A protein has these predicted regions:
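Short, small/polar-rich loop/turn modules that mediate ligand/substrate recognition or access, typified
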Residues: 73, 78, 144-146
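Short C-terminal tail/terminal secondary-structure segment
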Residues: 46, 133-134, 145-159
Length: 159
């Protein structure tokens, strides 16, 4: 674990949420309401071996979401978080490659192991996350706040 990796990950994954929210809240209050959607991860629910800074930053986003939902509800501002599971694409491919290297296994085996941790046995697509976000900002979700919504095919563990 390198200090530089820790600082960079916290800056990107956690501080960016703080700064965005700090500047968005006055606009939402002026507008008499709205919706904030934070992006966390299932790593923020389970932890994630070999990705400590990432998991810590995503746990913190859940805390921010819960706290802000309590603070901003009186202003008709809803705050929720989406926790995607493993998302198909370059990023998960890099994670699979790194884990395969660290344990001396093939990438195919590691990918199969990752998929085995998910009840639906598949990774999430970006569109799945977008669909949840669309729902959370809609009028149909007008009474949903302070919730941590997983879009993960039912990830049961991360190891």
């Amino acid at each position: 674990l390198k200090i530089e990796d820790w600082k960079e990950t916290i800056d990107i994954n956690l501080n960016s949420h703080f700064y965005f929210t700090k500047f968005a809240i006055p606009l939402l209050k002026k507008n008499k309401g709205g919706s904030i959607i934070n992006l966390s991860s299932t790593a923020g629910l389970f932890g994630f071996p070999l990705r400590t800074p990432y998991a810590a930053s995503k746990w913190a986003i859940i805390g921010i979401t819960k706290s802000l939902a309590m603070e901003l509800g009186e202003f008709n501002i809803r705050v929720n978080a989406i926790c995607p599971g493993s998302v198909s694409g370059d990023r998960i491919n890099r994670v699979i490659e790194a884990k395969a290297k660290s344990i001396g296994s093939s990438e195919k085996e590691v990918k199969e192991d990752f998929e085995a941790m998910v009840s639906l046995k598949t990774f999430v697509d970006k569109e799945d996350i977008a669909n949840m976000a669309s729902f959370l900002i809609s009028n149909e979700a007008s009474k949903i706040s302070g919730q941590i919504m997983t879009v993960d095919g039912n990830t049961e563990r991360m190891d």
